[in-house]
Design a protein with these regions (language model features):
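Walker A (P-loop) phosphate-binding loop of ABC-type ATPase nucleotide-binding domains
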Residues: 3-6
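ABC ATPase nucleotide-binding domain helices that frame the ATP-binding cleft
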Residues: 9-12, 108
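Helix-to-loop junction immediately C-terminal to a conserved catalytic motif
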Residues: 16
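A position-specific signal in ABC ATPase nucleotide-binding domains
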Residues: 19-20, 27, 67
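Conserved coupling/switch loops of ABC nucleotide-binding domains, chiefly the family-specific signature
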Residues: 22-25, 75, 175, 207
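Conserved ABC transporter NBD signature motif
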Residues: 24-32
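ABC ATPase nucleotide-binding domains
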Residues: 38-44, 48, 52-195
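Glycine/charge-rich catalytic "coupling/switch" loops of P-loop NTPases
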Residues: 189, 217-271
Length: 280
């Protein structure tokens, strides 16, 4: 996960073998693969534009990677039928890609990447061209396929909601470096730096100085002069400069009970969003 130009797709292309690393080594199941050509790495790939062969039927598209690997005809028939069933497209084998909807084409692309039992599947923003409802539906579908067959999926996206929905672990990229690698909840609750805090979810940030610290609380004096009690993530000592992060959903407007961090403010704008209201 990361903004445009952060190095996500370059990283994926190195894993696939389409880019050559300038330093280091890539290991797959403990074996170095940097000098192995892409077609011999045994890695499945799903692109944003699907890359289906338009002159082949759905069955032939799925059979192609198996024929290249010299699989027998009987095994090809079984594997293709199993892969189509996995993506809920049984009975679509004789259709041409042009006869399918965008969501169906995407499922064929996923099935083709899985049909030869790869050890890893790489997905490069595969849902970017779909509308919102179909994209959300496909997120759950890919997640369920992953859970049912247990294959490792490396999935590139700039959509943080998509990353939080689908992932066991998320690597946040910026400027070619991994800023944080952790579970979705840890990424959201305990960002390691201000970039991750501001990139994941929405955030209000305040600069200040730590004036007191204990094991699970610290007091920060903001540049405005207000004092805030906060969770000390990566805070080491009194006197250091820090940034306080406040998620919008954690703010309570006009609380009925007395509580910490109670401050006066002025509402400038109220925006209705259907299932929630934004207050600025």
């Amino acid at each position: 996960l990361g903004p445009s130009g952060s190095g996500k797709t370059t990283c994926l292309m190195m894993l696939a073998g389409f880019e050559t690393p300038t330093n280091g080594e890539i290991y797959l199941d403990g074996n170095p693969i940097s000098n192995i050509p892409p077609h011999k790495r045994g890695i499945g790939m799903v692109f944003q534009n699907y890359a289906l062969f338009p002159h082949m039927t759905v069955f032939e598209n799925l059979a192609f990677p198996l024929r290249v690997r010299k699989i027998s005809k009987d095994d090809i028939d079984k594997k293709v039928e199993k892969a189509l069933s996995m993506v809920s497209l049984s009975g679509f084998g004789n259709r041409m890609p042009g006869q399918l909807s965008g969501g169906q084409q995407q499922r064929v692309a996923v099935a083709r990447a899985l049909v030869f039992d790869p050890s890893v599947v790489l997905m490069d923003e595969p849902l970017g061209a779909l509308d919102k409802n179909l994209r959300e539906s496909m997120q759950y579908e890919i997640k369920h396929i992953h859970e049912s067959i247990g294959v490792t999926v490396v999935y590139v996206t700039h959509d943080q909601g998509e990353a939080l929905t689908m992932s066991n672990r998320i690597a946040v990229f910026n400027d070619g470096k991994v800023q944080q690698l952790s579970s979705p909840d840890k990424l959201y609750e305990e960002p390691v730096n201000s970039f991750v805090a501001e990139f994941i979810g929405e955030n209000n940030t305040f600069s200040g100085e730590v004036i007191d610290i204990s094991e699970n609380k610290c007091k920060v004096k903001l540049n405005s002069g207000n004092e805030i009690l906060a969770n000390p993530i990566r805070v080491k000592s009194k006197g250091e400069k820090t940034i306080v992060s406040l998620r919008p959903e954690r703010a309570i407007i006009d609380p009925k009970n007395d509580m910490d961090n109670k401050h006066k403010g002025k509402i400038e704008e109220v925006i209705y969003h259907g299932d929630h209201t934004r207050v600025r």
